[in-house]
Curated annotation (Swiss-Prot):
Sequence similarity: Belongs to the CGI121/TPRKB family.
Effect of residue 138 to R: Severely affects Bud32 binding and does not stimulate Bud32 kinase activity
Annotated protein name in UniProt: Regulatory protein Cgi121
Function: Component of the KEOPS complex that is probably involved in the transfer of the threonylcarbamoyl moiety of threonylcarbamoyl-AMP (TC-AMP) to the N6 group of A37, a step in the formation of a threonylcarbamoyl group on adenosine at position 37 (t(6)A37) in tRNAs that read codons beginning with adenine. Cgi121 stimulates Bud32 kinase activity via an activation of Bud32 autophosphorylation.
Length: 145
């Protein structure tokens, strides 16, 4: 599985109609690569919420059960993105279409990003923000549809 950060991507919704196996997340609310890996693991091992594995990653990463809410929270937008692909060939094809600069640092947390993540994921109080996001993902199993 390939997980890369891309700075300054331009998202054209046509890429989602190409039949390729990938997902793009808004990197501005990704709490490190660990967040993405946890979402992938949950997508592989838990009862599916979405119809496709790739959409399941988005749903799990958002900490939501509703696909439309997941897209609002962590769906692809122009700017910094996290591109998740099965293989190099798919990565190259999508990267050619969205452009930008490969930069995994967009997946790391800084003060402003932590503030945004705490707000979006409704994380109150202190504690490691990455661990709290992982908890939110795990708690999806307990939420009612």
């Amino acid at each position: 599985m390939i997980i890369r950060g891309i700075r300054g991507a331009r998202i054209n919704n046509e890429i989602f109609n190409l039949g390729l196996k990938f997902q793009i997340l808004n990197a501005d609310v990704v709490a490190t690569k660990k967040h993405v890996l946890h979402a992938i693991n949950q997508a592989k091992t838990k009862k599916p919420i979405a119809k496709s594995f790739w959409m399941e990653i988005l749903v799990r990463a958002s900490g939501q059960r509703q696909i439309h809410e997941a897209i609002k929270i962590i769906g692809a937008k122009d700017g910094n993105v996290c591109l998740i692909c099965e293989d190099e060939e798919t990565f190259r094809k999508i990267y050619e279409l969205i452009g930008g600069e490969i930069d995994d640092s967009v997946l790391e947390i800084n003060e402003d990003k932590e503030r945004l993540i705490r707000e979006i994921f409704k994380i109150r109080g202190f504690g490691n923000v990455v661990e709290r996001v992982l908890e939110k993902i795990a708690l999806i199993e307990l939420k009612k549809e």
